[in-house]
């Protein structure tokens, strides 16, 4: 699960802490507001340099125009404070929430495709201190060291203890500087919730705000949310309460499976970044791994690859439209001359639902054919798909999907969902 390796500075910042962090509501966790979208990213630079490429529109609209985490992965003590301060200032001016991912721990990725980081833990602490100075007390969401807790196979018992101490110190240092800090929980197909809870406890999650999961991976949001609930319960049983989850949804809108996405064309971008999760245990869905950046299998880790970005973009995915206690997101999964195939993901809100109905309007020349995973009716240009008996009841945050074949021009319908 190698995250991107590139020079990147991200601080999730808002000028006023009260505007960013709330005490939590029934519809979301402890974050509010919109995420900061940096203008100068690898995806945006590629789009600007390739205006006539056939892939440009899709990459621009579905990836470059979305906010994604900005990584601090280049260990440079001379420039890091100014870099962070500049970014935090830009975010505060925009009134948005940028996301800072720190990726500089020694022995990161256990020497794999994203190897690098600080030469030792003392230097690492100096680096963290400079980042904290750059934050200067401004509210900041921080994704602290992907893989650092879930991936320990290359470390001895003494090295694990030293890393835990370093992460604990980093969390406290960054929180004192205004940080909202989340620690590494791996993902739902890796360590068990019980094992990961033990590791998080040892790494000082009691002094952090929560944990993140699915970074650089492809597991569904529903699976990650279920894993998060189990992990929160495991932490609670150890006397560590009040922790919440962040889920990386940058690449979990298609196939799951092996962590490396450099050669897999079945992967898609997932839920757009948002703090409106509809789940009090989940603070945000964030694109931690910027879509289009390689894992290190076929291409250099962290390098932007337009073919990967275009494959992940697939077809436009409209943001969830909340109505009642469910939301729906549309994605075109394939298209051909005269027709296309679409897929809709239904997500329950903060309360369980017994059923759902999704509605959208056909454009000129479109008609719906076969539908699977739901029961369709059409009235004029309005299509309504209701759940089957086996996929209508959803727990809070759980998802169901249906698909359909259609004739006519491809479009991106504004799908809406109501609970039945």
What are these regions (language model features)?
Residues 37-64, 173, 188-312:
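Surface-exposed substrate-engagement region within the catalytic domains
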Residues 30-134, 138, 290-305, 309-312, ...:
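N-terminal carbohydrate-binding/catalytic regions of secreted carbohydrate-active enzymes
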Residues 322-338, 349:
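Low-complexity, acidic Ser/Thr/Pro/Gly-rich terminal tails and inter-domain linkers that flank the onset
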Residues 1-28:
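Secretory targeting and sorting signals
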Residues 336-343, 400-401:
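Short, solvent-exposed loop/turn segments enriched in Ser/Thr/Gly
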Residues 327, 396, 401-420:
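Terminal connector regions
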Residues 352-379:
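Short acidic, flexible loop segments centered on an aromatic residue
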Residues 114-138, 146-178, 193-197:
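Active-site cleft segment of glycoside hydrolase catalytic domains centered on the general acid/base Glu
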